[in-house]
């Protein structure tokens, strides 16, 4: 279990970014990231320039359409995005999955036209089982950001319907011109850090969305231990929390951060437990056919918000 900081939404001069591919990888190294995904708009031309000796990287693309932006990671071949429209997106996603790709919804509530044509998600997905992840947090953190709040609400509603969708953060990294408090996605990568194992972590729900601090949990039940993304039975459990508040401390710039509590959230956004961050082991009686995620709450510059959100565990 590693939980390594990754950036899964990056652009270069092959679309509208300012980095060359090598500059992007070097900047990610300087930012102490373990892995990136190159997701230029409607092109994979930069992927051939990726050098895993500089930094392990995922080959991807951001489908940039009039009806939303969709991230495709690791597909073994081309799927035509140019004729993607609201009512054929399920078929398009199936084509991506058939080529081994991982599918993510980018910034579903970003401002659309005229600010960013197609930036808001307007595709009509009927089978969310084929969607692997959703960007619930996007770009720099300003905590009056309704776009992120709405994305978390959408993700929660899909979890309630039984869809197992991983949560991610996307910096949407184009350059270093923009200043701000940028987060990361922590991936629990099993084995070597590479595209294959990173994609497996996303598929399996082993993801944590964070403003910087690292928090994850394990669940103990009847002699067995379960990790984020896994499924267990209903009944009495012990949740064990692991927290590193200084994991990416350099990224907080001048923000004043205070970490206050851990919450466990379940169906409907209900909080079933809240404890001080010093309390690392709690008992929770899990219900059948539910999901449970952990959130680290605190304040940034006096505004109270979740600072870490994990993907859930599930009960059957």
Predicted features, each with a name:
Residues 26-27, 157-160, 191:
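Short hydrophobic/aromatic segments of transmembrane alpha-helices and their interfaces
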Residues 1-116, 120-123, 129, 135-155, ...:
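A metal-dependent hydrolase metal-coordination microenvironment
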Residues 159-169:
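Metal-dependent active-site segment of extracytoplasmic phospho-/sulfohydrolases and closely related
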């Amino acid at each position: 279990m590693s939980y390594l900081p990754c950036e899964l939404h990056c652009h270069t001069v092959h679309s509208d970014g300012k980095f060359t591919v090598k500059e992007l990888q070097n900047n990610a190294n300087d930012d102490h990231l373990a892995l990136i995904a190159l997701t230029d708009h409607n092109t994979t031309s930069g992927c051939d320039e990726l050098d895993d000796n500089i930094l392990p990287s995922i080959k991807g693309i951001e489908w940039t359409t009039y009806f939303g932006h969709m991230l495709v990671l690791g597909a073994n071949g081309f799927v035509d995005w140019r004729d993607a429209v609201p009512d054929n997106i399920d078929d398009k996603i199936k084509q991506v999955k058939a080529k081994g790709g991982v599918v993510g919804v980018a910034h579903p509530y970003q401002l659309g036209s005229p600010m960013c044509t197609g930036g808001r998600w307007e595709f009509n997905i009927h089978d969310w089982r084929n969607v692997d992840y959703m960007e619930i947090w996007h770009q720099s953190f300003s905590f009056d950001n309704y776009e992120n709040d709405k994305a978390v609400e959408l993700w929660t509603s899909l979890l309630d319907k039984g869809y197992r969708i991983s949560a991610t953060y996307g910096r949407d990294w184009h350059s270093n011109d923009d200043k701000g408090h940028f987060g990361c996605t922590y991936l629990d990568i099993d084995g070597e850090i590479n595209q294959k194992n990173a994609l497996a972590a996303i598929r399996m729900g082993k993801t944590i969305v964070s403003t910087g601090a690292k928090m994850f949990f394990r669940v103990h039940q009847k002699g067995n231990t379960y990790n984020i993304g896994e499924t267990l039975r209903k009944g009495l459990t012990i949740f064990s929390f692991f927290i590193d508040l200084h994991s990416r401390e350099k990224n907080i710039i001048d923000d004043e951060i205070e970490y206050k509590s851990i919450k466990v959230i379940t169906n409907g956004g209900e909080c079933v437990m809240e404890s001080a961050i010093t309390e690392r082991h709690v008992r929770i009686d899990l219900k059948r056919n539910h999901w449970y995620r952990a959130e680290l709450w605190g304040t940034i510059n006096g505004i109270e918000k979740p600072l870490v959100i994990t993907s859930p565990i599930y009960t059957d």
